[in-house]
Amino acid sequence: MEASGIRKIVKRLIRKTGTNNPFEICKNLGIYIEYKDLGNVLGFFKYNRRQKFIFINNRLCLMMAKQVCAHELGHVTLHPCVNTVFLDICTYAVTEKFENEANKFAAELLISNEDILENKEKSIEAIACLLEVSKNLVEFKMEGLYANPNLIKNHSYFNER
């Protein structure tokens, strides 16, 4: 799915739930969040008997747990019938496309266009630190943002100069 399609889905979800907090969105949508010791796995999504579950490694700090929740919410929203843990472990199918889409979803959910554009002079690391997200998430957001010049051109930050 294109970044613009993911952006539209995220905007609708934020409008519907009134928040960009992935934990609150899950609560509003009836998605259960479970914290477990998952070893090296950060998290995963499971659909079981019409119930949706997001499992998050209980060893993660709040910042990482929030990102993992946003990423897994991306799977819930974009790939509700695909069990990527099953695909990875049992079938060795290539899941890179699904993972990239879930990362783009998380970036769109947790980082606004304004967050990037108003801090464009700063390094990726500085923006990540300021927003309390990973550097990779900032890179995903920037990739999607700069792929659509209209988002930049129409932003008030650039029109005021």
State where each predicted segment sits.
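Active-site hotspot residues in diverse enzymes, especially metal/ion-binding acidic/histidine motifs
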Residues: 1-161
